[in-house]
Amino acid sequence: MLSETFISRFDGRVLNIHPSLLPDYKGLNTHARVLADKKTHHGVSVHLVTAALDDGPLLAQMKLAVAPNDTETSLSERVLALEHQLYPAVITALAEDFVHVEGLNVRWSDTSRLRSITGGVVCFPPLD
């Protein structure tokens, strides 16, 4: 975890990709916890980093259905594939000024490019 001093120096400029549909399942072992809770959906979130663990404004999320035969390994692999789609797409959107963050508020001016990169399954605003 990064210190509050470090985070404050880069406020609003540090991203994290997290393997869950935040705010659910902050921290480690997300796939095992999802399976243990018999959830039907899982996914990935991109958010701005704050001093609190896996907290901060959500920029985007992608979800998938948990298959009846999923194991921690298979679910992890499928979520990782979503991470590989979503993270670079969000970074591109930030670089091209399609997403704006003011405090805790996130506003997207254009989601079409991000949707085309990710196959259209991105959630804006992020899932509740």
Where are these regions (language model features)?
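SAM-dependent methyltransferases
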Residues: 101-128
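Donor/substrate-binding cores of folate-linked one-carbon enzymes
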Residues: 1-109
